[in-house]
Amino acid sequence: MKAESSNESFIIGQRVHSLNDSRRVGTVKYVGDVEGYSGTWIGVDWDQDGDGKHNGSVNGVFYFNGRSQSSASFVRSQNLSRGITLLQALELRYRTISTKDEEDEMYVLSAGNRRVSIQLLGGDKIQDKLSRFEELTSASLSYLGVSSLGVSSDLGSILPNLKLLDLTGNLISDWEEIGALCEQLPALTTLNLSCNSLSSDIKSLPQLKNIRVLVLNNSGLSWTQVEILRRSLPGIEELHLMGNMISTITSTSSSDDQAFNSLRLLNLDDNCISDWSEVLKLSQLPCLEQLYLNKNKLSRIFQSVNGTESSEKGSDPFPSLSCLLLGANNIGDLASVDALNGFPQLVDIRLSENPISDPVRGGVPRFVLVARLTKVQVLNGSEVRAREKKDSEIRYVRMVMSKLNDKSGEIELLHPRFYELKKLHGIEDERASAENSGPKNIASGLISITLKCVGPSMGEKPHLTKKLPGSITVGKLKILSENFFKLKSIKPRLFLQEEGSPFPTALDDETATLLDVGICDGSTLLVDEES
């Protein structure tokens, strides 16, 4: 069953797709004549840049504003589809015989915009089961051109057991239609409306008491609309809002309202939030356990701003938050890392693709982050085991001791956990004085490191374990490595291999000591060659 066009007039704002490609979706922006061409034309602004030919102007004549220079085009009405009903889409997806290509395209889109394939094992038996709609518990109708429920549809009796419905990339825009859909499906708990251009006018929306997971990625929503929506979502537990260009989190609710009291996961990945004060407006959500803020524009984290609405007096911010994902932002200071210790339950943190976690951009190695984060159990997706935690804290303390003079105020300001960790691990001051700088003291300052040759031109060489003073420089160790491994005409480059880190850390500062860069007893260094 293919959606067909008709001779009915198209209207401004209507969602349509190309008759021959249901994935080519757009919005009608103009209906009328085009100078130099006969007949009536439909001006469409396509969702994907490049699907059009211009920006809404032709031969110097302006007709409508396109989103970009290549998002707009003029199309004859017979080449556009207004879409099909939900029941027609169900028939198309589950009651027609699928070709191999169509089966390859059958998938459910996860909340994180990843495809989860549906494998049709058992062939005819599964096809027979799927064709009995009353047995369906999940349905993927993505990119089928669904635009409405249809006239006099009784979805409740047709789909009594449907719990998950994926309507990604369709033509739905009317919130009243969405409300009616949820009311008619009594078992529905998960609804994915990603990549539908949803109306900014949200009114007459009923209470969607059964919806637990709502996915609205790339749907053009502002936070003001989210605040209106939340009044109809008393039981919502997961809300996904990726790619909506949200930059501010405003509140339209009164102080008496209990907004999102059951919300456990909020996904704000790939938005435009740059000020941590906006994030702090979420800090009193009582059940929020997971907050995703990857790919935003955050540069700094702090606890509160002089009694702002970020937190109520006497209460901890984010009291239930255990997972905070901040990958691919602009965070570059250690004070922001330290601020995360103020979240009482936070154990899973992502800081990858930030300047602070990239030593090449002036950041710090993984062990420093592990040591400074009091409760961390998972960092950048890798588990922090007890051994790594202990080793990182000891390395960190020794690194600080090698760098700073004994100025307690300065140390406490720059390294808030230093004295706590020094006491925890029983680390004594190791600065040599005139009377205790003899051979015994020098021996006690030696650290055992393992060197591994990995350069492609170095050949196979056995690993070496050496005891060296922590005070020697990286440059000196490079020279020693040349001697240890008899490297002729090869300039070595050293890397520190850290547990839990997917990539080794380059040691390029030749004046830094081993203690400066966090090398301690048991560390492994890779000896590579300069490219």
Swiss-Prot record:
GO terms for biological process: embryo development ending in seed dormancy. LRR repeats lie at residues 84-109, 159-183, 185-213, 233-256, 260-284, 285-308, 318-342, 344-366, 474-497. Disruption phenotype: Embryo lethality. Embryo development limited to the formation of a few giant cells lacking microtubules but not actin filaments. Failure to localize KNOLLE in mitotic cells. It is found in: Cytoplasm. GO terms for cellular component: chloroplast. Residues 32-76 form the CAP-Gly domain. Keywords: Chaperone, Cytoplasm, Leucine-rich repeat, Repeat. Its main location: cytoplasm. InterPro entries: CAP-Gly_dom_sf, CAP-Gly_domain, Leu-rich_rpt, Leu-rich_rpt_typical-subtyp, LRR_dom_sf, SDS22/Internalin_LRR, Ubiquitin-like_domsf, Ubl_TBCE. Coiled coil: none annotated. Pfam families: CAP_GLY, LRR_9. Belongs to the TBCE family. Supercomplex made of cofactors A to E. Cofactors A and D function by capturing and stabilizing tubulin in a quasi-native conformation. Cofactor E binds to the cofactor D-tubulin complex; interaction with cofactor C then causes the release of tubulin polypeptides that are committed to the native state. Belongs to the PILZ group of genes that disrupt, when mutated, the microtubule cytoskeleton and produce mushroom-shaped ('pilz' in German) embryos. Essential tubulin-folding protein involved in the tubulin folding pathway. Not essential for cell viability. Probably involved in the binding of alpha-tubulin in the multimeric supercomplex. This is Tubulin-folding cofactor E. It comes from Arabidopsis thaliana (Mouse-ear cress). The gene is TFCE.
